Curated annotation (Swiss-Prot):
Protein name: 1,2-dihydroxy-3,5-cyclohexadiene-1,4-dicarboxylate dehydrogenase
Highest taxon in the source lineage: Bacteria
Reaction catalyzed: (3S,4R)-3,4-dihydroxycyclohexa-1,5-diene-1,4-dicarboxylate + NAD(+) = 3,4-dihydroxybenzoate + CO2 + NADH
Name of the gene encoding the protein in the UniProt record: tphBI
Function comment: Involved in the degradation of terephthalate (TPA) via the protocatechuate (PCA) 4,5-cleavage pathway. Catalyzes the dehydrogenation of 1,2-dihydroxy-3,5-cyclohexadiene-1,4-dicarboxylate (DCD) to yield protocatechuate (PCA).
Keyword annotations: Metal-binding, NAD, Oxidoreductase
UniProt-annotated binding residues for a divalent metal cation: 159, 203, 255
Documented EC number(s): 1.3.1.53
Entry-linked Pfam families: PdxA
GO biological process: phthalate metabolic process
Length: 315
């Protein structure tokens, strides 16, 4: 079955992680015609080494590739280095620029390693922040949405301490996240999603018994969203609403509220979309797996599902 109908840019992520390997493994499962719609961004040397490890050298012959990101040869599998962090950002940035310029229709980026990127001296809290910075947008306009196991969960905050997240949460930030996620759901074939907003505190604060945060932040956001004509329930306790599984879209206030259910139900099959920007970008719902990099045992299921998700014919 053909799964790729649109032009895609595929950045290989951290070249010392499993990105080069899963990129090649996913591409191997596509037809030649489908591969012709995908341009790969990243150091060629890392792809060559991954191909040798996985005995896929012949795949490189018809690979459409653009060199992006410097890397010492050979790749240091599993090593967390500033050079690999810089390469990650360079390859993803080149792919985003290609999409912004109309050369491709969407961007897929393999896993990054945040420590490597920070060691390169680059402020980074995930692909959503990178997308916002490359596009010149405010980071409060771009969010992460995980898709997997029948769930769609947008995160209002992401890679920051709980203290920082609580200081940054506001009704407007929640509204921004939901509006971006509803637009994305339309692109994914769910035009009028039923939305559930998680509470910040347990039991959505239990009528202020556990704090004022939900009455001050999530409840006003829900009221605003309803006035915009959206079908929104909440705020509700995340545990209760996830157990019911009655909604099309869930809104997590904190990182673990959204990541735990997705990684429990779809550990190797989730997509991680950066939403709210004028470029469609997705990564996968797992990390760079430095502990198994360069061994040829990485699972490309999540990447292949992400390719299918973004490669589908629009409309």
């Amino acid at each position: 079955m053909t799964i790729v109908h649109r032009r895609l840019a595929l950045a290989i992520g951290d070249p010392h992680g499993i990105g080069p390997e899963i990129a090649l493994k996913a591409l191997r499962q596509l037809s030649a015609n489908e591969r012709s719609l995908i341009k790969v961004y990243g150091p060629w040397s890392a792809l060559e080494q991954a191909a040798q490890i996985c005995q896929m050298e012949s795949l490189l012959q018809d690979l459409i590739h653009e060199e992006a990101g410097s890397l010492a040869q050979p790749a240091q599998w599993g090593e967390i280095t500033p050079q690999a962090g810089l390469s990650t950002v360079q390859s993803a940035t080149a792919a985003i620029r290609a999409c912004e310029n109309g050369e491709v229709d969407a961007v897929i980026a393999c896993p990054h390693h945040e420590t490597a990127i920070h060691r390169a001296g680059i402020a980074f809290s995930g692909y959503p922040s990178l997308l916002a910075n490359v596009l010149g947008m405010n980071e409060d306009q771009v969010f992460l949405m995980l898709v997997g196991a029948g769930l769609r969960i947008v995160h209002v905050t992401l890679h920051e301490s709980v203290r920082s997240a609580l200081e940054r949460l506001s009704p407007q930030l929640v509204v921004n996240a939901v509006q971006a996620a509803v637009q994305t759901c339309t692109l994914l074939g769910v035009p009028k999603p039923q939305v559930a907003v998680f509470g910040i505190n347990p039991h959505a604060s239990e009528g202020q018994l556990f704090g004022l945060e939900d009455s001050q932040i999530t409840a006003p956001a829900v009221e605003t969203l309803r006035k915009c004509g959206l079908a929104v329930d909440g705020p509700m306790g995340a545990d209760m609403v996830l157990a019911q599984r009655k909604h099309d879209l869930y809104v997590a206030m904190l990182h673990d509220q959204g990541h735990i259910p997705i990684k429990l139900l779809a550990p190797n099959g989730a997509s991680a979309l950066s939403i709210g920007g004028r470029v469609v970008l997705s990564s996968v719902g797992h990390g760079s797996a430095m502990d198994i990099a360069g061994r040829g045992v990485a699972d490309s299921t999540a990447l292949l599902r992400t390719i299918a998700l973004l490669g589908a014919q629009p409309g």
